[in-house]
Curated annotation (Swiss-Prot):
Protein name as annotated: Leukotriene C4 synthase
Positions in the Cytoplasmic compartment: 1-6, 70-73, 125-150
EC number(s) from the headed UniProt entry: 4.4.1.20, 2.5.1.-
Taxonomic placement: Eukaryota, Metazoa, Chordata, Craniata, Vertebrata
Binding site for glutathione: 30, 51-55, 58-59, 93-97
Amino acid sequence: MKEETALLATVTLLGVLLQAYFSLQVISARRTFHVSPPLTSGPPEFERVFRAQVNCSEYFPLFLATLWVAGIFFHEGAAALCGLFYLFARLRYFQGYARSAQHRLDPLYASARALWLLVAMAALGLLVHFLPGTLRAALFRWLQVLLPMA
């Protein structure tokens, strides 16, 4: 089991560390802009950092669920690579949003594409998993004809 999920576990841990980094950035922004908890509003510079962290936190459970389902039922390497791309896009999103609301858009779209790709891989993997054996074999034969290099 460990060997089969090591890549997914690594990407998960990197994601947790990234979430911790975002939280530390909010703490730093609170100190810089003198915004004490539980306040969530202040100068626009603080609010952008705060919103970026909250937005990233809101999507993290979706990311983790699709990463693991895609990795287990589709392909661990493909899911891990897509997960790394998602995390990198989220880092760029956070950094861009901290600068200005406009700078968040390109990384936001990139992370959304990565998340949708994970959803597609997870759904396809589950579909194939639940297909009856004869249909699954026919599908794989059809794919081998369609993609002879694979």
